[in-house]
Every structure is written in structure tokens, then in C-alpha cells.
Design a protein with these regions (language model features):
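C-terminal binding/interaction regions
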Residues: 20
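A short linear hydrophobic-aromatic micro-motif
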Residues: 37-43, 83-86
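Absolute protein N-terminus
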Residues: 1-2, 92
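Active-site-flanking beta-strand signature of metal-NTP-handling nucleotidyl enzymes
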Residues: 3-9
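Short, charge-patterned binding micro-sites
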Residues: 40-61, 90
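C-terminal structural segments of small proteins and small subunits
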Residues: 57-92
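Beta-strand elements of well-folded, non-transmembrane domains
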Residues: 9-13, 59
Length: 92
């Protein structure tokens, strides 16, 4: 089972693109290491307070994939000052 999902994030406290890039770089590296998923910033690279992250993960079962997505969401919300505005998910 392949799960593709996108998160639209609001970063209300970033003051520059450099600061945003540093926050996202740290976040993405930790997520990749911890959850073994592929993730990139796929949109809004030039917007200081917004970002869209695209994830792909593979699991044998749909329930496991959804559970891992929820763990990633929880990790982001607990460890970073961001707001998840939108979630789009699709099973491939």
C-alpha cells in the first residue's frame, strides 16, 4: 500500500525565508530519519509563512499507513510552532 499525502502548513512566527528553510530542513530530516518516509517541500517555497509538504510512505496495510501518517502529524504539531491548515491524502 502506497500512501501519498500533502500537508499545508502555516508558520506564523517565521520572519524570513532563511528562518523558514532552517525550520523545515530540521523538521524534514527528523521525519525522514524517524519514520522512513520520503518528504519534500513541494510548494510555497517563497512564502515566509506557508509551506506545502508532500509525503510518500509504503506499508503492507492501509491501517498501518494511516497510523504512521497520524504519528507524523502528531510529531509535527508537538515539536514545531506550525499549524496544519489542510491535509490531502491518496492511496495509490
Amino acid at each position: 500500500m502506497i500512501l501519498f499525502f500533502e500537508l499545508e502548513l502555516k508558520l506564523p512566527y517565521t520572519n524570513s525565508l532563511k528562518e523558514k528553510r532552517n525550520i523545515l530542513k530540521s523538521m524534514l530530516e527528523k521525519i525522514k530519519r524517524r519514520y522512513n518516509v520520503s518528504v519534500i517541500e513541494s510548494d510555497a517555497q517563497d512564502n515566509i509563512n506557508r509551506s506545502r509538504l508532500s509525503f510518500v510512505l509504503i506499508s503492507l496495510y492501509q491501517n498501518n499507513a494511516v497510523s504512521q501518517m497520524q504519528e507524523i502529524l502528531q510529531f509535527i504539531e508537538e515539536n514545531y510552532e506550525v499549524e496544519v491548515i489542510d491535509i490531502i491524502k491518496e492511496f495509490l
